[in-house]
């Protein structure tokens, strides 16, 4: 006599706090064990790539803030680099240092949210409260430099929108001095915590070969022991002048990926310190009048400057025909922008490569054979945001 073993089909999300957005999972369960995971995406699709085709190059920048809304400036960075590549324009050194400085602040902004929310999913509330206090300070720096806490719209092809306000560099320096011990406090709470290790060690293991085959990048790739970081392998702006290490894991499990993110924040502190020390004086925008608007003082004196300013912001500037792909090491992995121009003031095609899209595809093989509670841990370690996955 044979027993017919029935599997249970379970719907998780999209309105579930642990799915980190609008993720819907169809789980095939054998009791408590997961047999199959089928992610349903597209619930936050806004047609960003198509919308960008109907905007000028300047008007397209805010769309990048709204993809991975946890780390907006890194995505603006990729778009700015792509447009600069087609324009073949020089970026002032001060602007390059400012962009690297804020990219690293953005990395801390992302990782603090990821570690805090991952701890909360597992049942530890303290790290979230400690880390959100630090995130608030970084968001204040965002606000001081761009006027906005989240959707900054700060990076520009050819530099940045505005120079740093007085006293900001000193305040960032003070922040990183006190952030270092705060990060050590979080480590002391989690690193050797018995419950934390039970929930993360040997969960969601990704071997080196699997990580490469699935197209993983960022901490998901480095957690498996592959030292691939675009800031080292394909440096952009002034990363080649800055001294930092690339942290890697050994086992490719959730615990190693957590440690990689912690160590990356220490490296970000080192990079920010070097940016503050080496920050040169000078312009923050290219001096090409086709890209940079005239100053307020000039507009008060000259009608031509007024017309130039108006036309620059209504019609934009023309970008030479051609195609390019530029990628940055965003906090979640490789964020790339493929730009195709036909020589007018709007992108003909803007293809966006997001790291979370590749990582979510690996959820099925990572969670197979684990308990349902472990699926929540794996979703947290993927560090997914649906703004960038659904686009």
From Swiss-Prot:
Enzyme class: translocase
Subcellular location: Cell inner membrane
Record-level GO cellular component terms: plasma membrane
EC number: 7.1.1.-
Lineage: superkingdom: Bacteria
Any one GO MF annotation of this record: quinone binding
Location, primary (coarse class): membrane
Keyword Cell membrane attached: yes
Signal peptide positions on this chain: none
InterPro entries membership: NADH_Q_OxRdtase_suD, NADH_UbQ_OxRdtase_49kDa_CS, NDH1_su_D/H, NiFe-Hase_large
Key words, A-Z: Cell inner membrane, Cell membrane, Membrane, NAD, Quinone, Translocase, Transport, Ubiquinone
Reaction(s) catalysed (UniProt annotation): a quinone + NADH + 5 H(+)(in) = a quinol + NAD(+) + 4 H(+)(out)
Gene3D superfamilies, sorted: Cytochrome-c3 Hydrogenase, chain B
Classification via PROSITE patterns: COMPLEX1_49K
Membrane topology value: Peripheral membrane protein
Subunit structure: NDH-1 is composed of 14 different subunits. Subunits NuoB, C, D, E, F, and G constitute the peripheral sector of the complex.
Family (UniProt): Belongs to the complex I 49 kDa subunit family.
Role this protein plays: NDH-1 shuttles electrons from NADH, via FMN and iron-sulfur (Fe-S) centers, to quinones in the respiratory chain. The immediate electron acceptor for the enzyme in this species is believed to be ubiquinone. Couples the redox reaction to proton translocation (for every two electrons transferred, four hydrogen ions are translocated across the cytoplasmic membrane), and thus conserves the redox energy in a proton gradient.
Name of the protein in question: NADH-quinone oxidoreductase subunit D
Organism annotation: Rickettsia canadensis (strain McKiel)
Gene name of the record: nuoD
